[in-house]
Amino acid sequence: MYKTKDILLTGFALFAMLFGAGNLIFPPMLGYETSSSWLLTMLAFIITGVGFPFLGILSVSIAGNGIKDFANRVSPTFSKIFAIISILAIGPMLAIPRTGATAYEITFLYNGMESPIYKYIYLICYFGIVILFSLRANKVIDRVGKILTPILLILLFLIIVKGIFFTNLAVKPDIYPHAFKRGFLEGYQTMDTIASIAYAGIILAAIKSGRTLTQKQEFSFLVKSGLVAIVSLALIYGGFAFVGAKMHSVLDTQDKIELLVKTTSYLLGGYGNLVLAICVAGACLTTAIGLVATVGEFFSSITSFKYEKIVIFTVIISFLLSILGVESIINISIPILVFIYPVIISLISLNLFGKYIKNNYVYKGVVLFTGIIGLIESLDSLGLNNYYTDSVLEILPFSDYGLTWLFPGIIGYILFSLMFRKAKMIENKL
């Protein structure tokens, strides 16, 4: 059996895995931009930034597969391609470079020390540390993370408490159009739904370690510990969004990191900014090391390349992309995430109820239809839209909520279920 203490410890471990310091830049700006609509915006953000990652872990628990096999019921070939794209997204193409860029910008850029020389020196040192600890099994970085994360959480708590209860700032009464859609799509940027599938095995192994539990008990343990993580994340994200909404009357900026830094400075003074820079940089560093190790282990398991070579290549690519800066990396990620997230969310939903779905063609239909809509929305985000694609997106139900793909996914499910209802559960290659 397990105790309440075990649930809390596992819950906070899951919280630490899903809580990326780099994700702190999103809630304040969402609150700042949406003003009195901040609560609806954050509800949507929490659904995609917190809820779906939790469901991702549950779906892996139910399906019994890791990320390499997560989409096997579509086809083994598709599953492998899906896994590669997902690992690249949370690895050298998006997430890892963003950790370096975030750490640099919070430390230097918005503290009056902007310089190309500082940037290159900082990022070289940053990724030098990443590659050093990724190549060598060492518990030092874990210990650093265990020290910095609590300090960061205390600092965040102080910012939230002071911003909410000890300031006389009021939220602007403006109503933001499409507030839910804004938050829902911004939640994609956390990339935690993708990461949750990759990390699910670690959490599941931790639950089973040293315990004799039935499958039902394991699932109950996971749900309860997951709720601890979800509530913790929701409180932090929601608190920062509310503080951001109140900052509109005293701060003028359109930059996410600048808003976070100036908010901290306004509420806690210069020393608060210094502590924020140290803690966020350290947290980003530990996140980057974990992601680089994940990329190295994944590609060394499916290719003939050695772990060390993959790590070096991953860090080099991440360094080069980090030079672009946080906003540029976010802009690059938008069309990619808009395309792959509908497919990922669909697969999570299907795997959650997989034992009730006897026909693998249903998986193919849902992925096909949601993938097409995701591709259209991706092209639209790049400005490659036309009259016909715009017309398709406009007539689809739930498009105002960022759920343009939902109705096509349901159609794909029904259509392929009827077309192949006599098909047995088989695994075909594309």
PLM-predicted stretches and their roles:
Residues 9-19, 162-167, 176-240, 275-284, ...:
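Hydrophobic, membrane-embedded alpha-helices of multi-pass small-molecule transporters
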Residues 29, 79-113, 284-300:
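Hydrophobic transmembrane alpha-helices that form the core helical bundles
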Residues 51, 55, 151-163, 195, ...:
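Selective recognition of specific alpha-helical transmembrane segments in multi-pass small-molecule
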Residues 62-70, 126-148, 209-212, 319-331, ...:
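Membrane-water interface regions at transmembrane-helix termini and the short interhelical loops
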Residues 67-75, 235-285, 292, 301, ...:
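TM-loop-TM module centered on a large, flexible mid-protein loop between adjacent transmembrane helices
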Residues 134-163, 334-345, 365-371:
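Membrane-interface loop-to-helix entry segments
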Residues 348-414, 425-430:
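C-terminal membrane-solvent junction of multi-pass transporters and transport-like membrane proteins
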